[in-house]
């Protein structure tokens, strides 16, 4: 079980990093390209400018601007997601052979691991494929958070009932962020038999998302909600219409 948590390590790391982020624009220096470091200059400022551009183009709505930027970010990582999908399909196809390896070498874990890796290489299965979309999104999500709290237009912007730079006073966004995270994990775990053994770990994420969303600027859980819905819809189109095996998994 522990060996299978590697896939979620990047997300856990990101959540812990974000936990240390402040919610006040005074916690950070202003966005000045002349004095900005590499990450600020090439990630935070362009993302802040992109949010400003879309907001100014659609009636000064930063809530909708975040939606557009979310879609752009998800489209950027879509090729990696498709690669992950293909690897996941291959993983499902080799499950019977993996079961035979586990049974044959049940008393020799090292040999079992060696034979499993040979099987992965033979069928082009990459067990790390699930990490890549998360790893790509990590710097973008960190940049998005700082773009929000360091951009005075976004920080003070009113969208629906909340100010995007402050926590949701009614906890609606934390609940929605946690709920969509739960649904996303549930939908994705149904596609991979290995994930079913990880449900107890995966269900921790919605709780973490809820707790952190209560203190984060509302724009970040709003991004999570948009991104989770995108993932749920994407998973349906990738897996939902696939033929099923006897075990109920996509073939």
Please give the residue ranges for each predicted region:
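Helix-loop-helix
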Residues: 2-251
């Amino acid at each position: 079980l522990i060996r299978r948590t590697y896939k979620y390590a990047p997300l856990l790391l990101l959540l812990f990093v974000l936990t240390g982020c402040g919610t006040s624009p005074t916690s950070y220096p202003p966005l000045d390209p002349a004095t900005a470091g590499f990450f600020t200059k090439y990630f935070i400022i362009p993302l802040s400018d992109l949010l400003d551009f879309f907001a100014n183009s659609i009636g000064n709505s930063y809530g909708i601007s975040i939606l557009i930027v979310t879609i752009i970010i998800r489209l950027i990582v879509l090729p990696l997601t498709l690669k992950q999908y293909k690897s996941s399909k291959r993983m499902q196809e080799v499950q019977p052979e993996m079961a035979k390896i586990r049974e044959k070498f049940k008393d020799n874990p090292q040999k079992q691991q060696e034979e499993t890796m040979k099987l992965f290489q033979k069928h082009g299965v990459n067990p790390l494929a699930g990490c890549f979309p998360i790893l790509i999104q990590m710097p973008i999500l960190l940049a998005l958070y700082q773009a929000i709290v360091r951009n005075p237009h976004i920080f003070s912007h009113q969208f629906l009932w909340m100010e995007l730079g402050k926590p949701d006073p009614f906890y609606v966004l934390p609940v929605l962020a946690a709920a969509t995270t739960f649904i996303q994990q549930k939908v994705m775990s149904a596609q991979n038999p290995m994930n079913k053994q990880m449900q107890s770990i995966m269900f921790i994420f919605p709780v973490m998302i809820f707790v952190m969303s209560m203190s984060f600027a509302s724009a970040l859980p709003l991004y999570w909600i948009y991104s989770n819905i995108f993932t749920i819809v994407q998973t349906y189109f990738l897996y939902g219409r696939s033929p099923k095996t006897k075990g109920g998994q996509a073939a």
